Amino acid sequence: MQLMVVSGRSGSGKSVALRVLEDLGYYCVDNLPVTLLPQFISTVENNEQDIAVSIDVRNMPSESGVIQKTLNSLDDKLDINVIFIDADDKELVKRYSETRRLHPLSKHDMSLEQAIQSESAIVADIKEHADLVIDTTNKSIHDLSETVRARVLGRESRKLILVFESFGFKHGLPTDADYVFDVRFLPNPHWVPELKPQTGLDQEVKEFLVGHAEVNKLIYQIRNFIETWLPLLEKNNRSYLTVAIGCTGGQHRSVYVAQQLADHFLHDGQQVQIRHRTLESK
């Protein structure tokens, strides 16, 4: 039986994630106090149905470590996965301003900005222990739904899922990455006029990059790093390993390198997901 714990800052998209899990057949409970989790599990464990519960700031224990201790106390047969949904402060302020809803902590005589910052400290403990952090800053409801669906369905094999994503440094670092590799020192197809409008998925750009020894050497070294430590990472009960590859704009070099790595590990029999952040945003 799987137990999905969904948490995150208010306004980030927890309710959307929970609805996706419900659509996938999970028995869902919204805003369950952490202290009631063991009792709740004991009442439904014979149903043989996967469970998802959401925990928000209103039900967070005041003492740090309580959530992790509670999860550790549950039946070893449970496959527990914690998903944390988040967005940057400016985006959360924007969402609350557009919907005109009150933040759960606003009733404590705080401004919206203060409430959002205060919530960050309260939920920091569960975020630190999350198996997956999803940043919804630049995601639509549809994007978030597809991300949750892909990650959850991908976990059915119970193997660690390798997630490769390309990005552009000028658009900011991805917050969900476990490892970030900077490939801005590689030869740049951007400066070749006929290659400038293309991407790292196009054949001419591939031929340009594969023709440079340093590109091939870097891909080999990143691949070797992952292959060396993957067995230990799998033993650490991780659900995902997210490797981000960044170049200046996220169009050529990072796309090519991320795709090459994804293709290699997919061919090697690993569970792989690939995302090109800049290309998907266009």
Swiss-Prot record:
Give the originating organism: Photobacterium profundum (strain SS9)
Q: What does this protein do?
A: Displays ATPase and GTPase activities.
Q: Which UniProt keywords apply?
A: ATP-binding, GTP-binding, Nucleotide-binding
Which GO molecular function terms does the record list?
Answer: ATP binding; GTP binding
Matching entries from InterPro entries are given as: P-loop_NTPase, RapZ-like, RapZ-like_N, RapZ_C
The record's section on SUPFAM superfamilies has: P-loop containing nucleoside triphosphate hydrolases (SSF52540)
Q: Does the keyword tRNA processing apply?
A: no
User: What does the record give as the organism's lineage?
Assistant: Bacteria, Pseudomonadati, Pseudomonadota, Gammaproteobacteria, Vibrionales
Where along this sequence does the record place binding of GTP? 56-59
The record's comment on protein family reads: Belongs to the RapZ-like family.
Disulphides: none
Highest taxon of source: Bacteria
Q: Which residues bind ATP?
A: 8-15
- Identify this protein by name: Nucleotide-binding protein PBPRA3258
Q: Which HAMAP family match?
A: RapZ_like (MF_00636)
